[in-house]
Amino acid sequence: MFDDALPADMAVESGDPREPSVPLFPEELALVASAVEKRQLEFGRGRQCARAALRRLGFADRPLLSGDQREPLWPVGVVGSITHTQGLCVAAVGQQRDYAGVGIDVEPSAPLPRAVADRVASEAEMSALDSMPPLLAARLIFSAKEAFYKCQFYRTRQFLGFFDVSLELEAEGEFAVHLLVDAGPLLRGDRFRGRWRQRNGFLFSAIVMPSEHRR
């Protein structure tokens, strides 16, 4: 559904968590044994999408466990990201020789509550998106920043606040993230490009960080 938001050499798979899915590995089941049913369904479909994407890169099925920050632990040589919302899970993976990180986020294509919007988007960012309804623009800003935070975590192992970056739309379906603080090997002023799509009732954001030799 959103393959065109990511490079052609990355594998992207999506699915509906409400539909039946392939059983999880026992090690994965243990991670969500005490979770509510909705969380279990989203986790299961997300892992199923991730394995389907990995198969396209030539990797055999295996358990995908979680790190201490609940991030997926990918096979050696792989970068990836999983996202889900009501009615949709998406996974994207690529080769680590080509990419230093990838982050994706899917959201309902609906206005963000005002109280949340004020915590994730600056007035300048909102003004730059004046062609969209304000709270829908805030949803896009939230999604794009979430995608970047997942992507940069591969490099920095650091958490960033919503106002540690600024978002700028460059063209229809594209955006740029400007880093406003130093974060590990990433420096204040660094700029990263991403893409967003609005389809079938969803907003989707994606950003990749090329490996050093591809910069």
Question: What kind of feature is each model-predicted range?
Answer:
Residues 1-215:
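Core catalytic alpha/beta fold that binds nucleotide/phospho-ligands
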